[in-house]
């Protein structure tokens, strides 16, 4: 049994993953605000399961050296800087530990067991506190070196005088969106909850209001959010020969969101046949928010020959 842990900007989720990659005993705790509390929380989670597990698999945002289990920068969690996560937990609990980027974990789970199976080039966009990206080919993650063979070569259509300004505008929009974190699902739900006058952020209530067409302002906010994600997808497609993109994170359970992103993506394509590539499929991760846990466990198993 593997203890899989998904470190997010809002919650730390965890569960037990068996040899058939089924998850049980899932739970979550709020992500601590300090490094000391972070260590205490992780150690409590592991201690509670230590007697029944053979290893620890961790999905974490940011820049990760997976071989060493070292976090260079933990995404939007400010205190996760230069953290030897794997070695410290191994030293404390005498258990093998593997750490992988959370979006890579989601993409790996979908490539091996879910919606990105049997593709030469697929991507997972994980929408949470921030936005994560994982690229896969068949059952494997694409490394910075291997990804170069999937770069899209310029076509005559894409180099046309009408296409180039649009592509530049698209690129700059996407860059600003990433810098400002406009793709954040947590940010969208927070803004939408405030718009509805809710006492606290409530994703299900937000989407119920969207589906019930309760507020024109909310509809516009939702349309803008879907447009931001569609721009990210189209930007990715302009660089890589993608066959499919899946949307991950807890928000991916909302069918209305996937439909909204797909509609916005089709709208971007409608008047731009000169882009030089065809539309691709956008759908939810098969395992939704569990993709991170399953992918981390799968990475642990493959690295330890289990």
Region annotations inferred by a language model:
Residues 30-33, 79, 148-151:
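A short acidic/small-residue loop/turn micro-motif
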Residues 27-29, 75, 145:
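Short hydrophobic alpha-helix segments
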Residues 107-150:
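Hydrophobic alpha-helical segments and helix pairs
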Residues 1-55, 65-68, 89-94, 112-121, ...:
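ATP-binding/phosphotransfer module of carbohydrate and carboxylate kinases, centering on a glycine-rich
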Residues 4, 100, 108:
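Generic enzyme active-site microenvironment
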Residues 69-82:
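A charged helix-plus-loop insertion that forms the helical arch/lid used to bind
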Residues 97-103:
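General beta-strand structural signal in soluble alpha/beta enzymes
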Residues 60, 129, 249-250:
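Short secondary-structure boundary segments
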